């Protein structure tokens, strides 16, 4: 057992792929191959087998947790003599750029919304709470995009706290990956879902990251169950570079793309740019700010080659 796994074993139950897959029980696969193709990311080979082996057991586990949460709330309301309030169950999904957080989030949204309870499941990404490029430029933070200081944490915490207080309608800003910026005057309306999936790089940050300021309130304070999607540094770098090259041949060719100029350079130069962006920005952010939050997650999914999950760690 390597040092990382030995440390995790103290606080987590470990499952290899086969052990985890056996926990699916009788949960049916309710997604078609066409739907899975629509859900997966640009650089991922998500298969029906992966959904059955990894995500169906996960959706079953989450269903148990959510049902337990509802029962606990009902007991408290009966004790207090209060009326039932619709408070969303919040699932946080964290991990590095290029690890496949968005695919995991979309897949869980599709699976959880199809459980017999017909729950309404909303998905919000923390990208919408990045400061605008104008603000980041003024503060000299354009090369720190995705780092904690690049987020409007005050509004993000306000958003999630209103969600958890049962507010009937909450607005979230919308981010465009094409424009690489917030879309002005565009909002996503979240109206009391049963489940909210919040996906982002730093959703597991807590006061431990700011020891000299005990007054911070963090997104993680409002999360009921958290998932960290993990992979080795080398795999993440490889996936990031491949994704960049695919974007260069696709989305970057759009004249409206913020990165349109990268579509004009040769493949060799594009690889050099991608490696630099990974090393100087995304890899640095991973090591400094994202990876240290991994062991705060309720569950860690560790990926191997081809984005296949090879092990799952569930907090005891």
From Swiss-Prot:
Q: Please provide the record's keywords in A-Z order.
A: ATP-binding, Coenzyme A biosynthesis, Cytoplasm, Kinase, Nucleotide-binding, Transferase
First-listed, main subcellular location of the protein, grouped into a coarse class: cytoplasm
Q: Name one GO cellular component term.
A: cytoplasm
Q: Where is the signal peptide?
A: none
Known EC number(s)?
Answer: 2.7.1.33
Task: Write out the pathway annotation from the protein's UniProt entry.
Answer: Cofactor biosynthesis; coenzyme A biosynthesis; CoA from (R)-pantothenate: step 1/5
Query: Family assignment?
Result: Belongs to the prokaryotic pantothenate kinase family.
Say which species the protein is native to.
Answer: Hamiltonella defensa subsp. Acyrthosiphon pisum (strain 5AT)
Localization annotation: Cytoplasm
Q: What is this protein called?
A: Pantothenate kinase
InterPro entries per record:
P-loop_NTPase, PanK, PRK/URK
Q: Which Gene3D superfamilies match?
A: P-loop containing nucleotide triphosphate hydrolases
Q: Which residues bind ATP?
A: 95-102
Q: Which GO terms fall under biological process for this protein?
A: coenzyme A biosynthetic process
One GO molecular function term of this record is:
ATP binding
Catalyzes what? (R)-pantothenate + ATP = (R)-4'-phosphopantothenate + ADP + H(+)
